[in-house]
Amino acid sequence: EGFFVTGISTRTADASIRYTLNGTKPTPEKGIIYDGPFLIASSTTVRAMAYKEGMVSTNVDAQSYFFTGDIINQSEMNPGITNSPTYRDELREALKKLPVVSLSFEQNTIFGRSGIYENSDDKGRGSEREIHFEYFDPANPDDSVHEPAGLRIHGGNSRQHPKKPLRIYFRDDYGDSRLEHDIFPDSPVKTFKSLLLRGGGHDAWTFDSRWREASFVRNQFLHQVQREMGQTSPHGRHVNVFLNGQYWGLYELQEFPHEHYNADHHGGDPEDWDIVKHGQEVEAGSRAAWDALIDLAESGINSSKDYAAIQEYLDLENFADAMIQRIWASDEDWLSPFFLNGRDISTFSDDKNWYVGRKSRNGTTKFFFYNWDAEMSMGIPFSDLQTFENDFSRINNARSPGIIYDALRRYPEFQLFFADRLRKHCFFGGALTLGPLRENWIDYTETVRSPVVAESARWGVQAWLEQDRFFPFTRDDEWLPAVNWVRDQFLPNRTREILNQFRQVNLYPNTEAPLILPFGVNSETPIEVSMNTGTNNSTIYFTKDGSDPRIAGLTSTTILIGENSNVRVIIPDALINNEIGFTWRSIKPPSNLNNWISGTNGVGYERSSRGTYLSFISTTVDEMWDTNASAYLRYEFEIPDLKTLQSLDSLVLQMRYDDGFAAYLNGTLVSWSNYGTSAWNSTSSSPTNDNEAVVFEGFDLTPQISQLQVGTNVLAIHGQNTSPRSSDFLIEAALTSSSSAPSKISPSALSYSGPIELNTSGVIKARTLTDSGQWSALTESYFSIASPADAGNLLVTEIHYHPADASTAGELTISTNKDDYEFLELLNTSGNEIDLSDYNFTRGLAF
């Protein structure tokens, strides 16, 4: 409010200063020559530089001044809000509630016919334009920073929205190569190579009128959930954005997980990192490690050896938590398929909106999986139906995190590991329990409660897919009901819903995990702990040494039909049908078997220019086109003896298919999908998307394992197309069986028979084991039996900072990096154990 008298100075004697007030960049030839302090009485961005003959000119500095009265009266602000008796008095304060990001620039480089806003599909370095970045908090004058930078339009679909996301790059070309400021107080990183301004995407009002459910906070909230699960996730905060002084709305200022982010958070140099995102697009480094990981997944996880191999690339905790968090979020703009009430309602069939990073050079890490662009979630539906019941537990997109999840979720050891992570996060105050979820949701929504009023004035009527609305969306009519629905419906119900969904795919057992009482307490004196389970005919086993009471068994896999297996195929016609009828399905060969085509697994044809199936087809049936929509296939395989047969305890059929099939094992129908009828010329009941067809879909045939016999067995497939003139066709089958050595009770495990006394600090880990051999998920609880730490019993006694290079043989064996020898020593001066669990270093340490 009021006015400012502003002066500009330089330390260089006799230097001249030029400045601008319209966002343009001053030069020694362009701009107002500074001759003394001047008055600023309206919203203004001052850009200034100093120059002197014979010397290098300074870079350009910028300082923005905003008057709330000016902002409210800008031409883009809707008078239905600015003059509203409900909102007009709140608007001035709403504009001060958040930090400000002000971007100043040559107007025609961003807007107008040649500007990047108009040409929003342009990408890459060539689309980057020079700007000046300012960040400041109206409530804290010391919390400010500014730096020359580059600007690009960001995103996919959201590039077309009227309120576009923006990427900011800090480079030597413009000023300093990194921005140095404590922008995100809860982040250990204080310098940034680039930042992202997200406009809200589908969680904003600028998509179309169906988006009444917008909250503007879903993305940040879900990053917070991933961090509270113990994983790394980009930090961010909400800001008010101004472009050349024009209020541009409520944005999220955040990190994004490129190579610089990963180096900052996980170590190494940016050049060491591979960054791969949706569509397998390589943002940095190489895709070699990602391809190796995907190849392992697409080959299937069928044995202990396979499970160990995939863990060379995967941190299972990070991966499982990422899948749990994203599935919990019910993100309709991510992976597929997903279901509601048993019906596939997938919005997209291609994979979208994921980011992974791996350090592959100068030392390696495993892949980190990041929550990314997750705002079309938590009741933001592409359909008009808000629900907390979407089921993403069967995602399987090819060459994406979905196929990794799909392969792992069929392996028994991962099933129980995944259940352990669910137990950790969905119970006992974990990240996906109602208390933390609701607290975080309320914190984020309260942060933007007033700023949403300004957003309503700026963007309440504009949308991408339609003409402007006649009445603006408002906080009280649209935003409040939307955020309250999440608070009162989605959050209380979603965790229970996903647990039920995961039970259906064997990722959470029906055996009830032990309840430990009390759970995770701090006490200065010994305490009594009890356990119970609701599962009958079971025993609780627990340990007090931090180990798992269960020892995993080993699993081996028998490939009955693989990618190089032989196959016989025929395209039936009326004469063939009259001769063989249904006998082709049985073990006994049909009478015309010598007329069948002999080949290798992977049967089909491809007439489309896309060529999607060519790499999967080994045996071509071009004669099928325009002749028949059906094909018959026979795979023969051997089980050598009774011992082998009796060792098989599971049976899984995997199918690539376009468009439908029915499978017969030794003449018995065991599985089908999109199957029309058994007629020799039947078409499929529905089509299969090409992207889905190339992904193996699993069908559990364990209940039909008794159909197997010693000697020759036959898997017969009736493959079906949508029509005889379909442009492509594909059938590929794989059949595997596994033999598992049972898991064991750990030698250090104790069976629970009654309350136990704890007199020392430690971790109790407990599982329920049923009499039939089924284990529960793991319940884990830490107990501190110690005095609280305070200034009377805890001292910092030694700091080893900036040590010399490692030189002795012993030192060089441990590490050649001298930073590894830095340490801080704490001393307990009491005679008893003290509890440090509630303490952390908030200042003075950086990594």
What is each residue range found by the language model?
Residues 61-62, 86, 676, 684-744, ...:
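An acidic-aromatic loop/edge-strand motif
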Residues 75-82, 90-126, 131-132, 157, ...:
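Middle-to-C-terminal accessory/interaction subdomains
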Residues 587-636:
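Surface-exposed, low-complexity/disordered Ser/Thr/Gly/Pro/Asn-rich loops and linkers
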Residues 103, 110, 114, 119-285:
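Conserved ATP-binding subdomain of kinase catalytic cores across diverse folds
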Residues 167, 183-184, 249-301, 307-308, ...:
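Surface-exposed loop and adjacent secondary-structure segments within mature catalytic domains
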Residues 554-559, 563, 570-572, 578, ...:
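Activation on beta-sandwich/Ig-like modules and their edge loops
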Residues 38-50, 527, 567, 596, ...:
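Short, well-structured beta-strand segments within conserved domains
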Residues 1-130, 135-150, 468-481, 485-565, ...:
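Short, compositionally stereotyped local motifs that mark structural "simplifiers"
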